[in-house]
Amino acid sequence: MVVSKSSPLIFERSREGRYAYSLPQSDIKTDSVESILDDKFIRKNKAEFPEVAELDLVRHYTELSNKNFGVDSGFYPLGSCTMKYNPKINEKVARIPGFAESHPLQEEGQVQGSLEIVYSLQEELKEITGMDEVTLQPAAGAHGEWTALMIFKAYHLDNGEGHRDEVIVPDSAHGTNPASASFAGFKAVTVKSNERGEVDIEDLKRVVNENTAAIMLTNPNTLGIFEKNIMEIREIVHEAGGLLYYDGANLNAIMDKVRPGDMGFDAVHLNLHKTFTGPHGGGGPGSGPVGVKKELASYLPKPMVIKDGDTFKYDNDIKNSIGRVKPFYGNFGIYLRAYTYIRTMGAEGLREVSEAAVLNANYIKASLKDHYEIPYEQYCKHEFVLSGSKQKEHGVRTLDMAKRLLDFGVHPPTIYFPLNVEEGMMIEPTETESKETLDYFIDAMIQIAEEAKNDPDKVLEAPHSTIIDRLDETTAARKPVLKFDNLHEEKE
């Protein structure tokens, strides 16, 4: 038998008349669909679902799952994504029946345990971030950004400063920052980085004005560099009447070392699915809690979960609230995982997490500095950016090297981001990887650098060992084939 590396689609396995279920004859009189629904809601043709037996169905998806790659499969140094190992105790707690089988519409008295988790997590995150109040409602990072910006907008309006319609973002910022600003009705204004990869203070003074609503920053920033002038940045923006927003994407570098609230930030979002080991990838679920200083607390989404004596309950009496931003109260399963992680680690453990994340990143950076261009030479925090400009001289681009890494069983780092580094490759090893894993990755990167110089075709034609060879990504982006019918049309 010839074994193919690729798998047929579930539609290609379909055979008319096969099915994967067996139901008894109904003994209840039922009406026809036609007698219930208007004709316009009834299909004219049979839905083209695949027809397969249960065994074929199970084998198909088992085969696909075995071809997936995740943190449990191998090293995943995807910069700015904090692809750390997710402890399995988190899953055990999330599956406790009292939590897993609860419903958001149950009466408060029936879900006191769940509400206590929500309240306790709010309190933990307040302490970690240095904020005065926290809402868990937002479903992800960008959702948290938007929520905080809507709070800023309401605050400025209430203070008679609705003209403040500009949000400052660094040229190294996450793409979600300007996107969230735009979505919230603001104009994004770029501030340049200096030669050290930090916010250029003089340029910041130039762009700040009476229309400044806020500045959005990560610290450490997207280049993995700590903004050592953060207190001066705070003073400049606050004096202009603006607010400071902390993008929590890089919090993994500073836990129990320094808090956003102590740096002068007025609001912060966190990624529970990154820093606090909620599983992520595949589109979710995520969680992007938002913390604020007391001046902004009355604008938080409602309801909040509060403690009244020995009882936990929803509080809808938030006078200036921007309203609900998520049905029910967000993604509760992620709260359970994050709370389990925080309680398991404790303050000392979270500090060690950040120390190990920073150590691992600097170890890789120092090991690769003689083989790749390092645009910013100072110590990094949890991640760093290198450049493939040396390899480009031999006709090999960062994309090619990322493809070659697949042959080593390593997920490629983030590439071509941030945009202000030529042929950039952003590497974030996280704290959970061993020295042996780091050394394996370093050796692979050094080998690829040598191949780019001495045997470039080997890199240009990579990957060689994956199930699917190099894709035509340009055509895939411009002419995507998203329906099975289209596949037939393409073949014809």
Curated annotation (Swiss-Prot):
The keyword Oxidoreductase applies. Its EC number is 1.4.4.2. GO terms for molecular function: glycine binding; glycine dehydrogenase (decarboxylating) activity; pyridoxal phosphate binding. Gene3D superfamilies: 6.20.440.10, Aspartate Aminotransferase, domain 1, Type I PLP-dependent aspartate aminotransferase-like (Major domain). Its cofactor is pyridoxal 5'-phosphate. GO terms for biological process: glycine decarboxylation via glycine cleavage system. SUPFAM superfamilies: PLP-dependent transferases. Coiled coil: none annotated. Keywords: Oxidoreductase, Pyridoxal phosphate. One of its GO terms (cellular component) is glycine cleavage complex. It comes from the Bacteria. This is Probable glycine dehydrogenase (decarboxylating) subunit 2. CDD domains: GDC-P (cd00613). Pfam families: Aminotran_5, GcvP2_C. The modification N6-(pyridoxal phosphate)lysine is found at K274. The glycine cleavage system catalyzes the degradation of glycine. The P protein binds the alpha-amino group of glycine through its pyridoxal phosphate cofactor; CO(2) is released and the remaining methylamine moiety is then transferred to the lipoamide cofactor of the H protein. The glycine cleavage system is composed of four proteins: P, T, L and H. In this organism, the P 'protein' is a heterodimer of two subunits. InterPro entries: Aminotrans_V_dom, GcvPB, GDC-P_C, GDC_P, PyrdxlP-dep_Trfase, PyrdxlP-dep_Trfase_major, PyrdxlP-dep_Trfase_small. The keyword Manganese does not apply. HAMAP family: GcvPB. Belongs to the GcvP family. C-terminal subunit subfamily. It catalyses: N(6)-[(R)-lipoyl]-L-lysyl-[glycine-cleavage complex H protein] + glycine + H(+) = N(6)-[(R)-S(8)-aminomethyldihydrolipoyl]-L-lysyl-[glycine-cleavage complex H protein] + CO2. The gene is gcvPB. It is an enzyme of class 1 (oxidoreductase).
